[in-house]
Amino acid sequence: DWSSDVCSSDLSFGFDKLNPEISNPKEIPVYGEVMTSRWAYEALAVTQFKNNEYEKIFYLYEKAMSQSDFKKNYWIRTLRNKLNAVERDINNKDKRKKVADDLFLIGNEIKKEMTHIKRIKFNSFEKLTVQKFDSTAFNEVTNYFDLVNEYYVRKYNIASAEKDKLISKYTTNDSAKKLFVLFKKQYYNDNLADFCRNSNEVERIVEYNGQLYQKIDPIFQDPDNKFLRAHFYSPRKQIFGVFIDTFWVNISIIWIMTIFLYITLYFKVLKRILDFLERMSEKLMNNKD
C-alpha cells in the first residue's frame, strides 16, 4: 500500500523539523503550513495508522496508555528532578535565575495539568517564587505530583486491562492466535507506526519557553491550540475549541488552498503584483535620476 511505499522510500519526515533553528517543538513552522504536501501526507498517514482495521480496535486504549505512560515516566519525573534541584539550590545566589526559571516552569505545568485533571487541586502557586518557596511548598508540590502519578497509574492499568481483554477475545485458541497475528500483519504497518509514534526520537520530552513538550507518540496526543495549529501527526485538531478528525480538517485545508490558487490564477493576481512592483521600481529609478 501507499504507506509501505512512502516509508520504505525515506520520504516520511516531520514537517515540524523543516528548520529546527527557527521552529518550536509545539507546532509546525508557518512556512511548513503552506505546503500542500504537508496536509496531504499527514491526513493519509494519520488515517492509515489510526483507522486501519487492526488499530481502530485498540486505538483508544493505546491512546490512554500512551498518555499515562508519558505523564508518569517522563513528565512527572522531569518535574520532580526540577523540584529537587530547586530545594537544593534555593539559597545558592549563583543559581538564582535557574531556580526562578524552574519554579516558573513547575507552576506552568501544574496549571496546564489542572485543566486535564480538575479534581486534583493545587492552591499554592504564590509560593512558587524564589522569595516564598519553602519546605511547605516543596511538600505541597510533591503531594500534588504523587496524586497525579497515582491517577495515571490507575488510568494506564485500566486501559491495559481492557486491551488485554479484547486481545483475549480474539485469541481463544491456537488457531485464533494465528489468525490474529495474520490480521495484524495485514493491516498494521510497523514503519508507519514508527513515524506516527516518533519512536526513534531521542528526546522524549523537551523544555521550551518555560513549558515542557512531548516529543513521542504524537499520534496519541491531542493539541492544545484552539484553532487549527497542532503538532505533526496529531490525530485530531481543534476548530474554535471543537475537535475534528485530522483527515477532514486537512482535506478541507487542501480544498481551500486549491480554490485560493485557482482564484489567484484566474484573476492573474500574481501577474498584477509583479506588474505593480515593476512600476514602483521604475518610479523609484526615475526619481533617483
Give a label for each model feature.
Residues 280-289:
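Non-transmembrane, juxtamembrane loop and terminal tail segments
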Residues 9-279:
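Extracellular/luminal re-entrant pore-loop and selectivity-filter region at the outer mouth
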